[in-house]
């Protein structure tokens, strides 16, 4: 059975397009952070970027997909690093959205599974969100 087509909101599309303008390929951490920020699964973000790169290549034959569309201007804000200084102690709190903040993380307390990128996404992003 085919999966229902994802209907992205205007805000999600704007954020995805803006990220695509700066980088056509996302790292695992960038993809996870963007997915959490937009309340999408990592797979949805990954597939959107794959489809968008295909569209870009079709409209820009012969150009390198690894280079940004436009060089950042001096008045644009610089992207700050997203990794904390000590990833072991503060990485999990960096990725937690407001709905599961350290003060609100009773659901995660007492779990014996380490909070990895994979299971954090499974906890935060139910697979059938928005599909009826």
From Swiss-Prot:
Alphabetical UniProt keywords: Developmental protein, DNA-binding, Homeobox, Nucleus
The protein's name: Homeobox protein ceh-1
Keyword rRNA processing appears in the UniProt entry: no
The UniProt record lists the keyword DNA-binding: yes
Region (Disordered): 56-80
PANTHER family, per database record: HOMEOBOX PROTEIN NKX (PTHR24340), HOMEOBOX PROTEIN SLOU (PTHR24340:SF37)
GO-annotated molecular function: DNA binding; DNA-binding transcription factor activity, RNA polymerase II-specific
């Amino acid at each position: 059975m085919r999966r229902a087509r994802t209907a992205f909101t205007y805000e999600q599309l704007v954020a995805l397009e803006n990220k695509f303008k700066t980088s056509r390929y996302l790292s695992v951490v960038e993809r996870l952070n963007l997915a959490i920020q937009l309340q999408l699964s990592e797979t949805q973000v990954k597939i959107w970027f794959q489809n968008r790169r295909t569209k870009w290549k079709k409209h820009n034959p012969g150009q390198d997909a690894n280079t940004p569309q436009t060089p950042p201007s001096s008045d644009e804000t610089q992207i700050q690093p997203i990794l904390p200084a000590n990833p072991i102690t503060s990485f999990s709190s960096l990725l937690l959205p407001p709905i599961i903040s350290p003060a609100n993380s009773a659901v995660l307390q007492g779990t014996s599974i380490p909070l990895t990128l994979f299971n954090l996404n499974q906890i935060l992003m139910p697979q059938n969100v928005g599909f009826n």
